[in-house]
Design a protein with these regions (language model features):
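Short beta-strand to alpha-helix junction loop
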Residues: 10-20
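Amidase signature
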Residues: 22-23, 42
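Short secondary-structure junctions and interdomain/linker hinges
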Residues: 29-30, 158
Length: 161
């Protein structure tokens, strides 16, 4: 990594073990580790940032939420193919779109089947914005006024005075 880049620990050594196990299972289905792929010795539950290329859309690394520093790279040729690949998963927490064409990015973000989309940046959440997933990535909404609505039931009561 470049000087000054910092990456935090995973939440627990058991979680790191789960991520490493899923990485191993995914690699058995195909793919090439370009960098990383191992635990970092010492305090905490650190893991090397890992990039795996040539990952098929059916691969566990493509289909599951690992919640670890693993990037599975899949090639595509057309925008429609990229959208179909992104939506062909049972999960829909977050998608990232990287492009210089913001009109294209917004069109793509509209059609992605996920609760959150980050364009040209690492995902950032604010208390005023909803944190939500689609499909099997969760039920409900956290943060924002939308979250408050999730826990309320509206009732209209009329009284003649």
């Amino acid at each position: 990594m470049s000087e000054g880049v910092r990456i935090g620990s995973l939440v627990h050594t058991d979680h790191r073990a789960d991520v490493l196990r899923m990485l191993e299972e995914g690699l058995a289905q195909g793919g090439t580790v370009v960098t990383g792929g191992a635990a970092v010795e010492g305090d905490g539950a650190f893991m090397q940032p890992t990039v795996v290329t040539d990952v098929a859309a059916s691969n566990l690394l493509f289909q599951e939420e690992l919640f670890g520093p693993v990037l599975a790279v899949t090639k595509f040729t057309e925008e429609a193919e990229a959208l179909a690949l992104a939506n062909d998963t049972p999960f829909g927490l977050l998608n990232g779109v990287w492009t210089n064409d913001l009109s294209r990015a917004h069109r793509f973000a509209r059609d992605l089947q996920s609760g959150m989309v980050s364009i040209n940046e690492y995902p950032i959440t604010f208390p005023q914005t909803a944190f939500t997933g689609w499909k099997q990535s969760g039920i409900g909404i956290e943060q924002s006024q939308d979250a408050l609505r999730f826990y309320t039931r509206v009732k209209n009561v009329n009284v003649k005075l």
